[in-house]
């Protein structure tokens, strides 16, 4: 470290520190700067030249280096001058020897650049790093060196991709002044870079700045009627709503006056489950807009909370549920079914939805998924399918849910028993005959015959025939039981079937005329005995 006391002891004749430093003493001490005069340290950051001129130590160091005055440079470095200024001065004076002397002490020449305003020196310093050309412009943006950007202005005008990369860099650094300079001096008309960076970094100030550029540079005042087309093309409202940036949306609406904006906001907010945005804009929306938003939410499989929020602003009615059912089927959304199952009229609403699902069911997995998720009895789905002639779905459900023959037969018979729709019942009973009858044994066949008689099955005649073949004596008893059931219900088609088999048994000698008159008086027709 430089010590004035030690210097005096080594240099002055009496080796004492003088009370006053005149020019002669300072020259003896070597504190003399050629062409400038004596030099003294004044405080921590300044030096005194010729006893009266006070300048910063780093400024003195820069000047000394530009003059290649090694002694003064060494002295000022000892006085805690910044080595970077010595390099800057050497570059200004093209003092390559001095640069070589101190260059190995510089770890990264980029660190010198913030201290340089002259674009030529800035460029020279950067070349010492042997870095690619674009880097110098990135550094100019980083440190807001407008003089450097201006120096390379004509190069930039010919290289728009480079300009856009500089804009992105400035946006990332939130360097608004540089962004302004680029747009104002290079006349850039592609504004999307600024908006992209603003959205990516959630920088509202930068986002607002983008609109300022549009109105001040791209769309002159007399052409402001073009702003709708320009802003719509940018689709900024779509982007910021998808991100959930409410403050960005409000900023956008200050400039973008498209009549479809509310629809865009609601659609995007529902799609991405941004309930804060929905809460803000729903009060400003029409009933039709909210309804359409709900359909979009179902289409995009929005969360239950989002669906609940939208439903809370609508009048839940059968008409609306019918509309919802179309979207449930089309987009296989189950969240809305879950919500409807919690409503006061849940049975009505669920029936509407499930009927639509069953009617349009293509993928068995979705129907089964609904049954499992909402604990829906498979028999309910089977009855719906039978009612609307979806027998393939009945087959798929019964095979998937009821793995063994006994369980399948039990549940299908119960579905028939609890079903009111007669055509649907008939289809189910035909289905049992077509898909379960083959696996039945004697007892099951007789039981099915009795069941068919109760419900007037179209296949009753065929089952009676098999029973008669299997065991004629037992069939005689079955026929007697069934005759009482059928007579009680007065079902003409079934009565005709029983009468025919009474006649057959009479012809076979199994039944006598006396037995017929005694046991079957209510349904007996002597025409079958002829």
Curated annotation (Swiss-Prot):
Q: Which InterPro entries match?
A: MGF_505
Q: Which family does it belong to?
A: Belongs to the asfivirus MGF 505 family.
| Record function comment | Plays a role in virus cell tropism, and may be required for efficient virus replication in macrophages.
Among Pfam families, the record links this protein to: DUF249
Protein name per UniProt: Protein MGF 505-1R
